[in-house]
Regions:
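Acidic/polar low-complexity segments with low predicted structural confidence
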Residues: 1-95
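Conserved small/polar residues in nucleotide/adenosyl-binding loops
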Residues: 272-274
Length: 274
Protein backbone atom coordinates (compact mmCIF):
# COMPACT_ATOMS: atom_id res chain seq x y z
CA UNK A 1 0.00 0.00 0.00
CA UNK A 2 1.26 3.47 -0.89
CA UNK A 3 0.12 7.10 -0.76
CA UNK A 4 1.47 7.67 -4.26
CA UNK A 5 4.59 9.42 -5.52
CA UNK A 6 3.36 12.98 -4.90
CA UNK A 7 2.53 12.50 -1.20
CA UNK A 8 5.37 10.17 -0.22
CA UNK A 9 9.16 10.22 -0.26
CA UNK A 10 9.91 9.56 -3.92
CA UNK A 11 13.02 10.64 -5.81
CA UNK A 12 11.61 9.71 -9.23
CA UNK A 13 11.02 13.07 -10.90
CA UNK A 14 9.55 11.48 -14.02
CA UNK A 15 6.87 9.65 -12.02
CA UNK A 16 6.02 12.78 -10.03
CA UNK A 17 5.62 14.81 -13.22
CA UNK A 18 3.51 12.05 -14.78
CA UNK A 19 1.11 11.87 -11.85
CA UNK A 20 1.04 15.66 -11.65
CA UNK A 21 -0.04 15.90 -15.29
CA UNK A 22 -2.80 13.35 -14.76
CA UNK A 23 -4.01 15.24 -11.69
CA UNK A 24 -4.23 18.46 -13.70
CA UNK A 25 -6.03 16.64 -16.51
CA UNK A 26 -8.58 15.06 -14.17
CA UNK A 27 -9.12 18.32 -12.28
CA UNK A 28 -9.71 20.25 -15.50
CA UNK A 29 -12.18 17.61 -16.72
CA UNK A 30 -14.05 17.90 -13.41
CA UNK A 31 -14.10 21.67 -13.78
CA UNK A 32 -15.75 21.49 -17.21
CA UNK A 33 -18.80 19.87 -15.58
CA UNK A 34 -18.36 21.38 -12.13
CA UNK A 35 -21.98 22.56 -11.81
CA UNK A 36 -23.31 19.08 -12.57
CA UNK A 37 -20.86 17.44 -10.18
CA UNK A 38 -21.66 19.88 -7.36
CA UNK A 39 -25.36 19.24 -7.86
CA UNK A 40 -24.74 15.50 -7.69
CA UNK A 41 -22.69 15.92 -4.50
CA UNK A 42 -25.48 17.92 -2.85
CA UNK A 43 -28.19 15.47 -3.95
CA UNK A 44 -26.25 12.47 -2.66
CA UNK A 45 -25.28 14.31 0.54
CA UNK A 46 -28.91 15.21 1.23
CA UNK A 47 -30.12 11.69 0.44
CA UNK A 48 -27.62 10.18 2.88
CA UNK A 49 -28.48 12.80 5.51
CA UNK A 50 -32.21 12.04 5.23
CA UNK A 51 -31.53 8.34 5.70
CA UNK A 52 -29.41 9.00 8.79
CA UNK A 53 -32.08 11.29 10.29
CA UNK A 54 -34.85 8.75 9.66
CA UNK A 55 -32.83 6.13 11.51
CA UNK A 56 -32.79 8.34 14.61
CA UNK A 57 -36.57 8.19 14.95
CA UNK A 58 -38.43 5.44 16.74
CA UNK A 59 -41.79 4.23 15.43
CA UNK A 60 -44.62 3.22 17.73
CA UNK A 61 -47.21 0.77 16.41
CA UNK A 62 -50.39 -0.61 18.04
CA UNK A 63 -49.82 -4.06 19.52
CA UNK A 64 -51.27 -6.78 21.74
CA UNK A 65 -48.30 -6.40 24.04
CA UNK A 66 -45.77 -3.79 25.00
CA UNK A 67 -46.38 -0.44 26.71
CA UNK A 68 -49.93 0.15 27.94
CA UNK A 69 -51.75 3.19 26.54
CA UNK A 70 -54.29 4.25 29.22
CA UNK A 71 -56.52 6.30 26.92
CA UNK A 72 -57.18 3.19 24.82
CA UNK A 73 -58.50 1.05 27.68
CA UNK A 74 -62.08 2.00 26.78
CA UNK A 75 -61.81 -0.36 23.81
CA UNK A 76 -61.79 -3.45 26.04
CA UNK A 77 -65.17 -5.14 25.65
CA UNK A 78 -66.47 -2.29 23.44
CA UNK A 79 -64.45 -2.60 20.25
CA UNK A 80 -63.10 -5.31 17.97
CA UNK A 81 -59.81 -3.43 18.04
CA UNK A 82 -58.40 -4.58 21.36
CA UNK A 83 -54.85 -3.35 20.83
CA UNK A 84 -54.29 -1.18 23.90
CA UNK A 85 -50.49 -1.44 23.85
CA UNK A 86 -47.82 0.08 21.64
CA UNK A 87 -44.59 -1.51 20.54
CA UNK A 88 -41.54 0.62 19.77
CA UNK A 89 -39.57 -0.10 16.61
CA UNK A 90 -36.00 1.13 16.75
CA UNK A 91 -34.79 2.27 13.31
CA UNK A 92 -31.23 2.89 14.46
CA UNK A 93 -28.95 0.67 12.37
CA UNK A 94 -25.77 1.92 14.00
CA UNK A 95 -22.68 3.63 12.60
CA UNK A 96 -21.29 3.40 9.05
CA UNK A 97 -17.89 3.16 7.40
CA UNK A 98 -17.22 3.03 3.66
CA UNK A 99 -14.30 1.90 1.51
CA UNK A 100 -14.22 3.09 -2.12
CA UNK A 101 -11.97 0.93 -4.31
CA UNK A 102 -11.13 2.09 -7.84
CA UNK A 103 -9.81 -0.07 -10.67
CA UNK A 104 -6.71 1.82 -11.89
CA UNK A 105 -5.71 -0.55 -14.70
CA UNK A 106 -4.99 0.46 -18.28
CA UNK A 107 -8.42 -0.68 -19.49
CA UNK A 108 -9.93 2.25 -17.57
CA UNK A 109 -7.81 4.83 -19.39
CA UNK A 110 -10.56 6.06 -21.70
CA UNK A 111 -12.81 6.81 -18.71
CA UNK A 112 -10.08 8.01 -16.36
CA UNK A 113 -11.41 11.54 -15.75
CA UNK A 114 -15.01 10.35 -15.40
CA UNK A 115 -14.08 7.61 -12.90
CA UNK A 116 -12.04 10.10 -10.86
CA UNK A 117 -15.05 12.42 -10.76
CA UNK A 118 -17.37 9.59 -9.71
CA UNK A 119 -15.10 8.63 -6.82
CA UNK A 120 -14.74 12.29 -5.82
CA UNK A 121 -18.52 12.82 -5.75
CA UNK A 122 -18.99 9.75 -3.55
CA UNK A 123 -16.21 10.74 -1.15
CA UNK A 124 -17.43 14.33 -0.87
CA UNK A 125 -21.00 13.29 -0.04
CA UNK A 126 -19.84 10.79 2.57
CA UNK A 127 -17.33 13.15 4.17
CA UNK A 128 -19.86 16.00 4.35
CA UNK A 129 -22.10 13.65 6.35
CA UNK A 130 -19.30 12.74 8.73
CA UNK A 131 -19.13 9.12 7.55
CA UNK A 132 -15.58 7.69 7.76
CA UNK A 133 -14.48 6.70 4.26
CA UNK A 134 -11.29 5.62 2.57
CA UNK A 135 -10.56 5.84 -1.16
CA UNK A 136 -7.97 3.63 -2.84
CA UNK A 137 -7.01 2.69 -6.37
CA UNK A 138 -5.51 -0.64 -7.39
CA UNK A 139 -3.54 -2.08 -10.28
CA UNK A 140 -0.92 -4.75 -10.88
CA UNK A 141 2.75 -4.24 -11.67
CA UNK A 142 4.83 -7.34 -12.44
CA UNK A 143 4.07 -9.77 -9.56
CA UNK A 144 2.55 -7.17 -7.25
CA UNK A 145 -0.90 -5.70 -6.70
CA UNK A 146 -0.49 -2.06 -5.69
CA UNK A 147 -3.04 -0.25 -3.52
CA UNK A 148 -2.77 3.53 -3.73
CA UNK A 149 -4.48 5.42 -0.90
CA UNK A 150 -5.98 8.78 -1.86
CA UNK A 151 -7.70 9.47 1.47
CA UNK A 152 -7.93 7.59 4.77
CA UNK A 153 -10.98 7.10 6.95
CA UNK A 154 -10.48 10.16 9.13
CA UNK A 155 -8.89 12.45 6.53
CA UNK A 156 -10.20 15.99 6.04
CA UNK A 157 -12.55 17.10 3.28
CA UNK A 158 -9.61 18.71 1.51
CA UNK A 159 -7.90 15.31 1.19
CA UNK A 160 -10.53 14.32 -1.37
CA UNK A 161 -8.62 16.43 -3.91
CA UNK A 162 -6.00 13.65 -3.90
CA UNK A 163 -8.46 11.48 -5.82
CA UNK A 164 -7.60 13.49 -8.94
CA UNK A 165 -4.13 11.89 -8.82
CA UNK A 166 -5.88 8.81 -10.21
CA UNK A 167 -4.34 7.48 -13.39
CA UNK A 168 -4.63 4.19 -15.23
CA UNK A 169 -1.85 1.77 -16.10
CA UNK A 170 -0.99 -1.92 -15.85
CA UNK A 171 -3.36 -4.81 -15.12
CA UNK A 172 -5.92 -5.50 -12.42
CA UNK A 173 -6.30 -8.46 -10.07
CA UNK A 174 -9.67 -7.48 -8.63
CA UNK A 175 -10.11 -10.49 -6.35
CA UNK A 176 -6.84 -9.91 -4.50
CA UNK A 177 -7.47 -6.17 -4.13
CA UNK A 178 -10.95 -6.78 -2.70
CA UNK A 179 -9.59 -9.41 -0.32
CA UNK A 180 -6.89 -7.03 0.97
CA UNK A 181 -9.33 -4.17 1.56
CA UNK A 182 -11.85 -6.44 3.28
CA UNK A 183 -9.21 -7.66 5.74
CA UNK A 184 -8.71 -4.09 6.99
CA UNK A 185 -12.37 -3.10 6.75
CA UNK A 186 -13.36 -6.02 9.00
CA UNK A 187 -11.35 -4.56 11.87
CA UNK A 188 -13.25 -1.26 11.87
CA UNK A 189 -15.50 -0.68 14.92
CA UNK A 190 -18.52 0.61 12.96
CA UNK A 191 -21.71 -1.47 12.83
CA UNK A 192 -22.20 -1.22 9.06
CA UNK A 193 -19.25 -1.80 6.75
CA UNK A 194 -19.65 -0.98 3.06
CA UNK A 195 -17.29 -1.57 0.13
CA UNK A 196 -17.96 0.24 -3.17
CA UNK A 197 -15.92 -0.99 -6.14
CA UNK A 198 -15.62 1.12 -9.30
CA UNK A 199 -14.53 -1.21 -12.09
CA UNK A 200 -15.12 -2.11 -15.72
CA UNK A 201 -15.96 -5.77 -15.07
CA UNK A 202 -12.74 -6.95 -16.73
CA UNK A 203 -10.33 -8.37 -14.14
CA UNK A 204 -7.16 -9.21 -16.03
CA UNK A 205 -3.59 -9.83 -14.87
CA UNK A 206 -1.62 -11.71 -17.51
CA UNK A 207 2.01 -12.47 -16.73
CA UNK A 208 4.08 -11.83 -19.85
CA UNK A 209 7.15 -13.89 -20.63
CA UNK A 210 6.59 -16.71 -18.16
CA UNK A 211 6.11 -19.57 -20.55
CA UNK A 212 2.88 -21.46 -21.06
CA UNK A 213 2.01 -22.24 -17.43
CA UNK A 214 -1.72 -21.93 -16.79
CA UNK A 215 -1.86 -21.58 -13.03
CA UNK A 216 -4.35 -19.08 -11.61
CA UNK A 217 -1.50 -16.65 -10.96
CA UNK A 218 -0.41 -16.69 -14.61
CA UNK A 219 -3.79 -17.07 -16.34
CA UNK A 220 -5.81 -14.46 -14.47
CA UNK A 221 -8.20 -13.44 -17.21
CA UNK A 222 -11.62 -14.17 -18.67
CA UNK A 223 -13.92 -16.54 -16.79
CA UNK A 224 -11.16 -17.52 -14.34
CA UNK A 225 -10.62 -13.93 -13.21
CA UNK A 226 -14.35 -13.15 -13.08
CA UNK A 227 -14.99 -16.27 -10.98
CA UNK A 228 -12.14 -15.42 -8.58
CA UNK A 229 -13.45 -11.87 -8.11
CA UNK A 230 -17.01 -13.11 -7.58
CA UNK A 231 -15.77 -15.54 -4.90
CA UNK A 232 -14.05 -12.72 -2.99
CA UNK A 233 -17.19 -10.56 -3.20
CA UNK A 234 -19.29 -13.39 -1.77
CA UNK A 235 -16.76 -14.06 0.98
CA UNK A 236 -16.87 -10.41 1.96
CA UNK A 237 -20.67 -10.48 2.12
CA UNK A 238 -20.58 -13.62 4.24
CA UNK A 239 -18.41 -11.69 6.71
CA UNK A 240 -21.07 -8.99 7.02
CA UNK A 241 -19.66 -6.47 4.57
CA UNK A 242 -22.03 -4.92 2.04
CA UNK A 243 -20.31 -4.93 -1.37
CA UNK A 244 -21.63 -2.70 -4.15
CA UNK A 245 -20.30 -2.35 -7.69
CA UNK A 246 -20.27 0.77 -9.85
CA UNK A 247 -19.83 -0.29 -13.47
CA UNK A 248 -17.49 1.96 -15.46
CA UNK A 249 -16.90 -0.23 -18.50
CA UNK A 250 -18.42 -1.07 -21.87
CA UNK A 251 -21.89 -2.54 -22.24
CA UNK A 252 -20.51 -5.80 -23.62
CA UNK A 253 -18.87 -6.44 -20.23
CA UNK A 254 -22.11 -6.07 -18.24
CA UNK A 255 -22.66 -9.86 -17.98
CA UNK A 256 -19.32 -10.21 -16.16
CA UNK A 257 -20.23 -7.36 -13.81
CA UNK A 258 -23.52 -9.11 -13.01
CA UNK A 259 -21.73 -12.39 -12.31
CA UNK A 260 -19.39 -10.62 -9.89
CA UNK A 261 -21.82 -8.37 -8.01
CA UNK A 262 -25.22 -9.92 -8.66
CA UNK A 263 -27.95 -7.27 -8.47
CA UNK A 264 -25.92 -4.98 -6.25
CA UNK A 265 -24.29 -2.74 -8.84
CA UNK A 266 -25.02 0.55 -10.60
CA UNK A 267 -24.48 1.32 -14.28
CA UNK A 268 -24.05 5.08 -14.70
CA UNK A 269 -24.73 6.17 -18.27
CA UNK A 270 -24.20 9.93 -17.90
CA UNK A 271 -22.91 12.58 -15.49
CA UNK A 272 -26.48 13.54 -14.59
CA UNK A 273 -27.03 10.11 -13.06
CA UNK A 274 -23.86 9.90 -10.97
Amino acid sequence: MTDGVIRSNCDNGFQKNLVGRHKVKNTLAYGVNKRIHKRNIHKLRDSIARTLVQEEFKDEIPSDQGMLVPNKLWRVGRSSNTKVFVRTLDNDKGSYVVDILIDSSGSQRRNQALVASQAYVLAQALTLNGIPNRVMGFNSFLDYTILKRYRDYESSLRANENIFEYYCTGNNRDGLAIKAVVEELKSRPEDNKILIVLSDGRPNDIKVGKGQSQTLEEAYRGATAVRDTAIEVRRARQQGIMVLGVFTGKERDLPAEKLIYGKDFAYILSLIHI
